[in-house]
Amino acid sequence: MNIPSLFVDPFSPLLEHPTEQRAKNVAHAPKRPCNLTQTEKMLAVRNALRYIPKEHHVLLATEFAEELNTYGHIYGYRFMPNFDLFAPPVSEIGAHCEQASAIILMILNNLDKRVAQFPQELVTYGGNGQVFSNWIQFRLVLRYLYTMTDHQTLVLYSGHPLGLFPSTPDSPRMTVTNGMMIPSYSTKELYDKYFALGVTQYGQMTAGSFCYIGPQGIVHGTTITVLNAGRRMGLDSLAGKVFVTAGLGGMSGAQPKAAKIAGCIGVIAEISDTALLKRHQQGWLDVYSKDLEEIVNWIKEYREKKEAISIGYLGNVVDLWERLAEEPECLVELGSDQTSLHNPFLGGFYPAGLTFEQSNQMMTSDPVKFKKLVQNSLIRQIAAIDKIAAKGMYFWDYGNAFLLECQRAGANLLREDAQDDKSFRYPSYMQDIMGDIFSMGFGPFRWVCTSGKPEDLRLTDQTACKIIDELKDTDVPEYVKQQYLDNKKWIEEAEKNKLVVGSQARILYSDRAGRVALASAFNELVKSGKVSAAIVISRDHHDVSGTDSPFRETSNVYDGSAFTADMAVQNCIGDSFRGATWVALHNGGGVGWGDVINGGFGIVLDGSSDAARRAEGMLNWDVPNGVTRRSWSGNAKAQEAIQRAEKQVDGLRVTLPVEADEELLKKLKF
């Protein structure tokens, strides 16, 4: 990788078109719908030309118009580097500000072809999780970061670099917003228009905040979910038990690895041979077949042997569920789905009866018919799931809007006693499993060793084990100790499980006390020189405080506030002035555009006392914020956790709820 070339002026001289790179065999995003009027298409080109010096307008106006017609979006492919991107050792970046070098490393990792779903379209995961809207923005952002000082802050509006603004060393080096819309215009239909115009983008969660660490990020969460789903069924061991699901993409590709780690038989449907083969070649998917009879035979064989294995079905998930529903016996104990149903009609879900290629063509050539086929397939899929669930399978929604889109397609999924429109017969994994884990304050904390050295990551793993050992012996409830034990097992086996894809990164579900201790210990490792370069700490937006999402992260909030977004917005504001190196606030992520508000952060631990101070101050807000909100909604585990935190954190005093007597309320007349 030619790192210095990433920081040159892309207009003087004008960069050559990266012909060799464009010709490489990588997965590409489907053509996007472009239902713009002639005037709006002119506006889209005009908007892109704003970045370009006037002398290049004639040439690039034609290029941009051709891209808009061909791909449904102006990606500015000319400005894409003519080589593969990846996260190099931070010492090779050499920006004027060390914190900015670390941010550049994180951006490059999000566009690594081993990590990103559609690297040339700047999509990291989820089908449309953009890092930037176009490659011109990529170039300008890297130039700004390379030259900035620690008295400046870079501001990004949905990928667009607004510029560098004066600030202080304690301020964030970068603030990011993605997809912030006037609420009544935050619809999926209008998103297509405004993305085509180049004025907003869908950053998913860690795609647009530059904190993605490859599928490892969701392996841990999926492992925890599968283990706890088994516990809900009274299973101490998942040996010989079958978990059926769908998706082997950027995030969902974690499922076969998680199934093996959990000790069960994972069966995962995937219609894209590129996505499936990527996981097979990576070693995360053991075997695969296009033949449903072979799939069923493998399931029966490994159920009998009680051996863990990951099995891929190269075909449509609807066909898999319907075939399994034909079996007289229940072959499936656990079921879910991780297709990208936040984006159901533009590549997030592929209907039965069409090939992958036919679907990619029809979704733009005949979107009305394609939508009908998708919804018919969802009806068929949930009907097959109903049949197997009636035999004893435990099925849950993985927060990808599966049940929501089935309901929108016409399926009757509400419970008989439902008091709202989100109380489905099948639970969200947040309601049954992860909600309580978040309420305890545990969530997907992560770190990146910017040296790029495996030995540095190994030392952080060992340090994390020691900290967990200390925490599990403190005065905490047994259910909290169980979380510590689960997470210690994860970190002990992390290197053996070969989870690193891209940067030298690790994820660990941790609570407030754990995160504060980890940040302090990591900063000391950098200060002492035991770790050879700065460590970036971050988390998924899908966390205790980071996301307001009534169909996922806050689906177990029952006081009527699940459809509000104060928590996520306040979290980003609070992180920004408490010490984050960068912060991000997004519309969408997980369930989809208009249905979620979420945010994240990054902190660079450089071994300084300032870094230690900032990390402690910020982490003592970033977790308790969400625990307090969950406590206020009535969650008992959150109430215990926040009262315990009040005794440990100076200055922390929260408002605790007083529960009303149910019989008193029933006597009231309205």
UniProtKB/Swiss-Prot annotation:
Which cofactor names does the annotation list?
NAD(+)
EC number(s) stated in the UniProt entry for this protein: 4.2.1.49
Kind of enzyme, top EC level?
lyase
Give an example GO molecular function.
urocanate hydratase activity
What are the binding positions for NAD(+) in this chain? Answer: 126-127, 204, 250-252, 270, 316-317, 338-342, 349-350, 398, 590
InterPro entries the record matches: Urocanase, Urocanase-like, Urocanase_C, Urocanase_central_sf, Urocanase_CS, Urocanase_N, Urocanase_Rossmann-like, Urocanase_sf
A Pfam family it matches: Urocanase
Q: Which UniProt keywords apply?
A: Histidine metabolism, Lyase, NAD
Keyword field contains Cell wall biogenesis/degradation: no
GO biological process terms, alphabetically, are: L-histidine catabolic process; L-histidine catabolic process to glutamate and formamide; L-histidine catabolic process to glutamate and formate
Which pathway, metabolic or otherwise, does it act in?
Amino-acid degradation; L-histidine degradation into L-glutamate; N-formimidoyl-L-glutamate from L-histidine: step 2/3
Give the catalytic activity. Answer: 4-imidazolone-5-propanoate = trans-urocanate + H2O
Organism's domain of life? Eukaryota
**Family per record:** Belongs to the urocanase family.
Name the UniProt record assigns to this protein: Probable urocanate hydratase
Q: Which organism is it from?
A: Caenorhabditis elegans
